[in-house]
Amino acid sequence: MKWSAEETSIVRQYENTSKKASDIYQQLFASGYDRTLKAVRRKIESMHLGKPYKNLDISKLPKILMLDIETTPIPVWAWSLGKQYVQTHSMMKDSNGKIIDWYVLSWSAKWLYDDEVLSDVLTSKEAIDRNDKRVLESAWKLLDEADIIIAHNGDKFDLRKIKARFLSNGIMPPMPYKTIDTLKVARKEFALTSNKQDYITRLLGVQKKLDTDFQLWVDCMNGDTEALKKMEEYNKHDVLGLEQMYLKLRPYISGHPNIAVMMEENVCSSCGSDSLNSVGKYYYTGSSKYELYYCNGCMSPHIRGKNNVSEKNIFVRSAAK
Protein backbone atom coordinates (compact mmCIF):
# COMPACT_ATOMS: atom_id res chain seq x y z
CA MET A 1 0.00 0.00 0.00
CA LYS A 2 1.30 3.45 -0.95
CA TRP A 3 2.52 5.62 1.91
CA SER A 4 0.53 8.82 2.41
CA ALA A 5 2.10 12.26 2.71
CA GLU A 6 1.30 12.35 6.44
CA GLU A 7 2.89 8.92 7.00
CA THR A 8 6.02 10.00 5.12
CA SER A 9 6.19 13.17 7.21
CA ILE A 10 6.07 11.11 10.41
CA VAL A 11 8.79 8.76 9.14
CA ARG A 12 11.04 11.74 8.36
CA GLN A 13 11.17 12.50 12.08
CA TYR A 14 13.62 9.58 12.34
CA GLU A 15 16.25 11.71 10.61
CA ASN A 16 16.22 14.80 12.80
CA THR A 17 15.03 13.66 16.22
CA SER A 18 16.21 11.03 18.69
CA LYS A 19 13.26 8.80 17.77
CA LYS A 20 14.02 5.18 16.89
CA ALA A 21 12.20 3.08 14.28
CA SER A 22 10.04 1.61 17.06
CA ASP A 23 9.02 5.13 18.15
CA ILE A 24 8.03 5.99 14.57
CA TYR A 25 6.04 2.76 14.37
CA GLN A 26 4.14 3.62 17.57
CA GLN A 27 3.44 7.15 16.36
CA LEU A 28 2.05 5.83 13.08
CA PHE A 29 -0.15 3.39 15.00
CA ALA A 30 -1.41 6.19 17.27
CA SER A 31 -2.25 8.23 14.16
CA GLY A 32 -4.41 5.41 12.81
CA TYR A 33 -1.99 3.88 10.30
CA ASP A 34 -1.61 0.10 10.09
CA ARG A 35 2.10 -0.41 9.40
CA THR A 36 4.38 -3.10 10.78
CA LEU A 37 7.71 -2.30 12.44
CA LYS A 38 9.45 -4.15 9.61
CA ALA A 39 7.66 -1.97 7.04
CA VAL A 40 8.73 1.16 8.93
CA ARG A 41 12.36 0.04 8.92
CA ARG A 42 12.21 -0.70 5.18
CA LYS A 43 10.68 2.74 4.56
CA ILE A 44 13.47 4.41 6.55
CA GLU A 45 16.06 2.54 4.47
CA SER A 46 14.34 3.33 1.15
CA MET A 47 14.25 7.04 2.05
CA HIS A 48 17.98 6.88 2.94
CA LEU A 49 17.32 8.46 6.32
CA GLY A 50 20.12 8.60 8.85
CA LYS A 51 20.87 10.33 12.12
CA PRO A 52 22.71 13.63 11.51
CA TYR A 53 24.21 13.33 14.99
CA LYS A 54 25.51 9.75 14.69
CA ASN A 55 29.11 10.79 15.37
CA LEU A 56 28.57 13.17 18.28
CA ASP A 57 27.36 13.33 21.84
CA ILE A 58 24.31 15.59 21.58
CA SER A 59 24.31 16.17 25.35
CA LYS A 60 27.52 18.21 24.92
CA LEU A 61 26.15 20.46 22.18
CA PRO A 62 25.39 24.13 22.80
CA LYS A 63 21.70 25.02 23.00
CA ILE A 64 20.57 25.49 19.40
CA LEU A 65 17.00 26.76 18.99
CA MET A 66 14.77 26.70 15.91
CA LEU A 67 12.34 29.63 16.09
CA ASP A 68 9.38 30.94 14.12
CA ILE A 69 6.81 33.56 15.11
CA GLU A 70 3.51 34.69 13.61
CA THR A 71 2.37 38.30 13.87
CA THR A 72 -0.76 40.19 12.92
CA PRO A 73 -1.01 42.66 10.04
CA ILE A 74 -1.37 46.39 10.78
CA PRO A 75 -4.96 47.66 10.38
CA VAL A 76 -4.90 50.88 8.34
CA TRP A 77 -7.24 53.23 6.47
CA ALA A 78 -6.48 53.49 2.75
CA TRP A 79 -7.92 55.60 -0.08
CA SER A 80 -7.39 52.95 -2.73
CA LEU A 81 -6.08 49.45 -3.43
CA GLY A 82 -2.64 48.64 -4.75
CA LYS A 83 0.83 49.77 -3.76
CA GLN A 84 0.88 53.05 -1.85
CA TYR A 85 2.74 54.83 0.92
CA VAL A 86 0.89 54.35 4.22
CA GLN A 87 1.84 56.76 7.01
CA THR A 88 1.35 56.37 10.75
CA HIS A 89 -1.67 58.72 10.77
CA SER A 90 -3.46 56.15 8.57
CA MET A 91 -3.25 53.50 11.28
CA MET A 92 -6.58 52.64 12.89
CA LYS A 93 -7.31 53.66 16.47
CA ASP A 94 -9.53 52.08 19.10
CA SER A 95 -12.38 53.84 20.95
CA ASN A 96 -9.87 55.35 23.38
CA GLY A 97 -7.81 56.86 20.59
CA LYS A 98 -4.97 54.34 20.98
CA ILE A 99 -3.26 53.17 17.79
CA ILE A 100 -4.11 49.58 16.83
CA ASP A 101 -0.64 48.20 16.13
CA TRP A 102 0.54 44.72 15.14
CA TYR A 103 1.31 42.12 17.82
CA VAL A 104 2.56 38.54 18.15
CA LEU A 105 -0.08 35.84 17.70
CA SER A 106 2.03 32.77 18.36
CA TRP A 107 5.51 31.32 18.42
CA SER A 108 6.91 27.85 17.93
CA ALA A 109 10.37 26.56 18.73
CA LYS A 110 12.38 23.35 18.85
CA TRP A 111 15.76 22.49 20.30
CA LEU A 112 17.95 20.87 17.65
CA TYR A 113 17.46 17.05 17.57
CA ASP A 114 14.86 17.18 20.36
CA ASP A 115 11.58 15.32 19.86
CA GLU A 116 9.32 17.99 21.36
CA VAL A 117 8.00 20.98 19.42
CA LEU A 118 7.33 23.86 21.81
CA SER A 119 4.74 26.55 21.14
CA ASP A 120 2.45 29.16 22.62
CA VAL A 121 -0.51 31.07 21.21
CA LEU A 122 -2.79 33.85 22.41
CA THR A 123 -6.09 33.03 24.06
CA SER A 124 -9.26 34.37 22.47
CA LYS A 125 -9.43 37.23 24.99
CA GLU A 126 -5.73 38.07 24.57
CA ALA A 127 -6.13 38.23 20.78
CA ILE A 128 -9.11 40.58 20.99
CA ASP A 129 -7.34 42.73 23.60
CA ARG A 130 -4.12 42.67 21.53
CA ASN A 131 -2.27 41.53 24.66
CA ASP A 132 0.74 39.40 23.71
CA LYS A 133 2.78 39.85 26.92
CA ARG A 134 2.21 36.29 28.19
CA VAL A 135 3.38 34.59 24.98
CA LEU A 136 6.33 36.98 24.78
CA GLU A 137 7.40 36.04 28.30
CA SER A 138 7.23 32.32 27.48
CA ALA A 139 9.30 32.91 24.32
CA TRP A 140 11.81 35.04 26.27
CA LYS A 141 12.69 32.07 28.50
CA LEU A 142 13.81 30.05 25.46
CA LEU A 143 15.72 32.92 23.85
CA ASP A 144 17.49 33.57 27.14
CA GLU A 145 18.59 29.91 27.28
CA ALA A 146 19.73 29.63 23.66
CA ASP A 147 23.35 29.81 22.47
CA ILE A 148 22.36 29.85 18.79
CA ILE A 149 18.98 30.76 17.27
CA ILE A 150 18.04 29.59 13.78
CA ALA A 151 15.20 31.20 11.82
CA HIS A 152 14.27 31.85 8.19
CA ASN A 153 14.54 35.62 7.71
CA GLY A 154 15.13 35.67 11.45
CA ASP A 155 17.68 38.50 11.48
CA LYS A 156 15.31 40.87 9.68
CA PHE A 157 11.90 39.64 10.84
CA ASP A 158 11.43 37.16 13.71
CA LEU A 159 14.14 38.38 16.09
CA ARG A 160 13.69 42.11 15.42
CA LYS A 161 9.91 41.81 15.67
CA ILE A 162 10.00 39.90 18.93
CA LYS A 163 12.49 42.39 20.39
CA ALA A 164 10.18 45.24 19.32
CA ARG A 165 7.37 43.64 21.29
CA PHE A 166 9.71 43.02 24.24
CA LEU A 167 10.41 46.76 24.23
CA SER A 168 6.70 47.66 23.97
CA ASN A 169 5.84 45.36 26.88
CA GLY A 170 8.68 46.44 29.15
CA ILE A 171 10.51 43.12 28.87
CA MET A 172 14.30 43.30 29.18
CA PRO A 173 16.43 41.66 26.44
CA PRO A 174 17.54 38.02 26.88
CA MET A 175 21.17 36.94 27.17
CA PRO A 176 23.26 37.28 23.95
CA TYR A 177 23.10 34.55 21.32
CA LYS A 178 24.46 33.81 17.86
CA THR A 179 22.08 33.59 14.90
CA ILE A 180 21.82 31.59 11.69
CA ASP A 181 19.43 33.09 9.15
CA THR A 182 18.62 30.38 6.60
CA LEU A 183 17.24 33.00 4.20
CA LYS A 184 20.65 34.70 4.15
CA VAL A 185 22.29 31.31 3.59
CA ALA A 186 20.00 30.57 0.65
CA ARG A 187 20.66 33.97 -0.95
CA LYS A 188 24.42 33.81 -0.41
CA GLU A 189 25.18 30.23 -1.39
CA PHE A 190 22.65 29.42 -4.14
CA ALA A 191 20.73 30.85 -7.09
CA LEU A 192 17.43 29.18 -6.25
CA THR A 193 14.23 29.96 -8.14
CA SER A 194 12.78 31.19 -4.84
CA ASN A 195 14.28 31.68 -1.39
CA LYS A 196 10.99 31.24 0.44
CA GLN A 197 10.98 28.50 3.06
CA ASP A 198 8.01 26.74 1.48
CA TYR A 199 9.79 26.53 -1.89
CA ILE A 200 13.07 25.30 -0.39
CA THR A 201 11.43 22.64 1.78
CA ARG A 202 9.46 21.36 -1.21
CA LEU A 203 12.64 21.36 -3.31
CA LEU A 204 14.46 19.34 -0.66
CA GLY A 205 11.51 17.01 -0.08
CA VAL A 206 11.14 17.82 3.62
CA GLN A 207 8.33 19.13 5.85
CA LYS A 208 6.03 21.43 3.89
CA LYS A 209 4.03 24.40 5.15
CA LEU A 210 0.33 24.00 5.90
CA ASP A 211 -1.98 25.70 3.41
CA THR A 212 -3.51 28.90 4.80
CA ASP A 213 -4.96 32.18 3.58
CA PHE A 214 -5.17 35.75 4.89
CA GLN A 215 -8.56 35.09 6.48
CA LEU A 216 -6.86 32.91 9.11
CA TRP A 217 -5.01 35.98 10.43
CA VAL A 218 -8.22 38.04 10.45
CA ASP A 219 -10.07 35.30 12.36
CA CYS A 220 -7.25 35.09 14.89
CA MET A 221 -7.39 38.85 15.50
CA ASN A 222 -11.13 38.48 16.10
CA GLY A 223 -10.44 35.86 18.79
CA ASP A 224 -11.68 32.79 16.90
CA THR A 225 -10.56 29.83 19.04
CA GLU A 226 -10.34 27.34 16.16
CA ALA A 227 -8.37 29.81 14.06
CA LEU A 228 -5.89 30.34 16.90
CA LYS A 229 -5.43 26.56 17.21
CA LYS A 230 -4.83 26.31 13.47
CA MET A 231 -2.33 29.18 13.65
CA GLU A 232 -0.38 27.35 16.36
CA GLU A 233 -0.35 24.17 14.26
CA TYR A 234 0.78 26.14 11.20
CA ASN A 235 3.56 27.67 13.31
CA LYS A 236 4.71 24.24 14.57
CA HIS A 237 4.84 22.85 11.02
CA ASP A 238 7.08 25.76 10.03
CA VAL A 239 9.56 24.94 12.79
CA LEU A 240 9.74 21.26 11.81
CA GLY A 241 10.41 22.29 8.22
CA LEU A 242 12.97 24.85 9.38
CA GLU A 243 15.01 22.23 11.25
CA GLN A 244 15.00 19.80 8.32
CA MET A 245 15.94 22.57 5.91
CA TYR A 246 18.77 23.77 8.16
CA LEU A 247 20.28 20.27 8.35
CA LYS A 248 20.25 20.05 4.54
CA LEU A 249 21.81 23.52 4.16
CA ARG A 250 24.36 23.14 6.95
CA PRO A 251 27.23 21.65 4.87
CA TYR A 252 27.10 24.79 2.68
CA ILE A 253 27.23 27.31 5.55
CA SER A 254 30.81 28.58 5.42
CA GLY A 255 30.25 31.12 8.21
CA HIS A 256 28.54 28.79 10.68
CA PRO A 257 28.95 29.84 14.35
CA ASN A 258 31.89 27.87 15.75
CA ILE A 259 30.40 25.07 17.85
CA ALA A 260 33.87 23.71 18.61
CA VAL A 261 34.69 26.89 20.55
CA MET A 262 31.46 26.56 22.55
CA MET A 263 32.23 22.89 23.32
CA GLU A 264 35.95 23.56 23.88
CA GLU A 265 36.83 20.31 22.11
CA ASN A 266 38.50 19.28 18.84
CA VAL A 267 35.29 18.68 16.95
CA CYS A 268 33.54 19.86 13.79
CA SER A 269 32.90 23.59 14.05
CA SER A 270 29.51 23.20 12.31
CA CYS A 271 27.93 20.19 14.04
CA GLY A 272 30.17 19.13 16.94
CA SER A 273 31.09 15.68 15.57
CA ASP A 274 34.53 14.29 16.41
CA SER A 275 34.58 12.16 13.24
CA LEU A 276 36.88 14.27 11.05
CA ASN A 277 39.06 13.17 8.13
CA SER A 278 42.02 15.15 6.85
CA VAL A 279 41.59 15.84 3.12
CA GLY A 280 45.23 16.67 2.40
CA LYS A 281 44.48 20.30 1.58
CA TYR A 282 45.13 23.54 3.42
CA TYR A 283 43.42 26.83 4.18
CA TYR A 284 45.64 29.90 3.87
CA THR A 285 45.35 33.28 5.56
CA GLY A 286 47.65 36.24 5.05
CA SER A 287 50.40 34.63 7.10
CA SER A 288 49.24 31.19 8.25
CA LYS A 289 48.43 27.71 6.96
CA TYR A 290 45.76 25.41 8.41
CA GLU A 291 44.91 21.79 7.65
CA LEU A 292 41.43 21.16 6.18
CA TYR A 293 39.09 18.40 7.35
CA TYR A 294 35.91 16.76 6.08
CA CYS A 295 33.21 16.06 8.68
CA ASN A 296 31.57 12.63 8.59
CA GLY A 297 28.75 13.92 10.79
CA CYS A 298 27.31 16.84 8.80
CA MET A 299 29.35 16.34 5.58
CA SER A 300 30.78 19.84 5.84
CA PRO A 301 33.98 20.51 3.86
CA HIS A 302 34.63 23.82 5.62
CA ILE A 303 36.43 22.49 8.72
CA ARG A 304 39.95 23.71 9.39
CA GLY A 305 42.39 22.85 12.14
CA LYS A 306 43.19 25.28 14.97
CA ASN A 307 46.97 25.13 14.68
CA ASN A 308 49.13 26.96 12.16
CA VAL A 309 51.09 24.22 10.36
CA SER A 310 53.24 26.54 8.28
CA GLU A 311 56.95 25.75 8.65
CA LYS A 312 57.92 29.33 7.91
CA ASN A 313 57.33 32.58 9.76
CA ILE A 314 55.94 35.07 7.27
CA PHE A 315 56.40 38.68 8.32
CA VAL A 316 55.60 40.43 5.03
CA ARG A 317 51.97 41.14 4.09
CA SER A 318 50.22 43.15 1.40
CA ALA A 319 49.25 46.69 2.36
CA ALA A 320 46.58 46.84 -0.36
CA LYS A 321 42.97 47.32 0.70
PLM regions and their residue ranges:
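Short recognition patches in nucleic-acid-associated and regulatory proteins
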Residues: 272-293
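Metal-dependent phosphoesterase core characteristic of DEDDh/y 3'-5' exonuclease domains
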Residues: 35, 43-53, 62, 102-120, ...
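Conserved RNase H-like, two-metal-ion catalytic cores of nucleic-acid enzymes
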Residues: 55-143
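Residues immediately within or flanking Cys/His clusters that coordinate Zn2+
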Residues: 263-268, 292
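Short, charged amphipathic recognition helices of the HTH superfamily
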Residues: 16-29
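Short, amphipathic alpha-helical "recognition" segments used to contact nucleic acids or chromatin
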Residues: 3-19
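Short, cysteine/histidine-rich loop/knuckle motifs that typically chelate Zn2+
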Residues: 269-270, 297
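Short metal-binding segments enriched for Cys and/or His
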Residues: 292-317
